UniProtKB/Swiss-Prot annotation:
Catalyzes the phosphorylation of pantothenate (Pan), the first step in CoA biosynthesis. It comes from the Bacteria. HAMAP family: Pantothen_kinase_3. It is an enzyme of class 2 (transferase). InterPro entries: ATPase_NBD (IPR043129), Type_III_PanK (IPR004619). The active site is at 105 (proton acceptor). This is Type III pantothenate kinase.
Length: 266
């Protein structure tokens, strides 16, 4: 039996990981928080030694150092590759003027989406600290994207930079809006703030989707991923598909596509 690939998606909010088998199926998955947020280390004691680790890290050098320490503690000398965006990989062509400027998480997500929905035009909306939108043609050409503050960041900015507005988390906002989204306008400040920022997310996505359909003169599947996808989905008025493993699935494809790392660092 071939060794699995360890896949790590280090985002700004949390770190997800998975083991992928020879068929690129995610056979074991988990997540853990950042040290700054009190996140405990993952329990990898039950995992077999992987062939190597393929990492997408958009969370900075401190997180990279923590991941190195975790990997060395569990599997000393384990080969690892920190992925970066390329001009072309796994059937996807990078349309950025400077391809390497595209975030590695977005690149892996594009590769995962192209494989998950072959032959379809896609608009991929991913909800994290930032909300990102990617336009991906059926032939694998990434033609560009948009980046906006995420739902939580929008609400936190209002709470931090105003004197009278509360600072709300997505958990609080989601609870406030439970059963209230049928009403187009809210009648207290916390719900008004929660709904206003949520509708800003939905409005951005629907506008981008309609513009893309008009520009391409073809059907476009809207794909949602990320932590706030359920809440934003309830505010949308257009058809959409949920997929929460695009980045890890893309990393599995990248791991298969690339040769085994030759050294412990890349």
């Amino acid at each position: 039996m071939s060794e699995p690939h360890l896949l790590i998606d280090a985002g700004n909010s949390r770190i997800k990981w998975a083991l992928a088998d020879a068929r690129r199926s995610l056979v074991d998955t988990g997540a853990f928080g950042h040290t700054r947020d009190g996140g405990a280390d993952p329990d990898w004691s039950h995992l077999p030694r992987p062939r190597g680790a393929w990492i997408s890290n958009v969370a900075g050098a401190d997180v990279a150092a923590r991941l190195d320490a975790l990997l060395d503690a569990r599997w000393p000398g384990l080969p690892r590759t920190t992925i970066r965006s390329r001009p072309v990989q796994c059937g996807v062509t990078n349309g950025y003027t400077t391809p390497e400027q595209l975030g590695s998480d977005r690149w892996a997500g594009l590769i995962g989406a192209h494989a998950a929905f072959p032959g379809e035009h896609l608009l991929i909306a991913t909800f994290g600290t930032a909300t990102t939108l990617e336009a991906l043609r059926a032939d694998g050409r990434f033609t560009g994207g948009l980046i906006a503050p995420g739902w939580a960041l929008m609400m936190r900015a209002l709470g931090t930079h105003t004197a009278q507005l509360p600072t709300l988390t997505t958990d609080i906002a989601s609870g406030l809006l439970a059963g209230a989204q049928a009403e187009p306008f809210q009648i207290d400040t916390p719900r008004s703030l929660s709904a206003g920022c949520l509708y800003a997310q939905a409005g951005l996505i629907e506008r981008a989707w309609r513009d893309l359909v008009a520009a391409w003169q073809a059907p476009v599947r809207l794909v949602l991923a990320g932590g706030a996808a359920d809440d934003v989905a309830r505010a949308l008025t257009v058809a959409h598909t949920r997929h929460d493993a695009l980045i890890l699935s893309g990393l599995a494809l990248i791991a298969t596509d690339t040769a085994a790392p030759a050294t412990a660092q890349d």
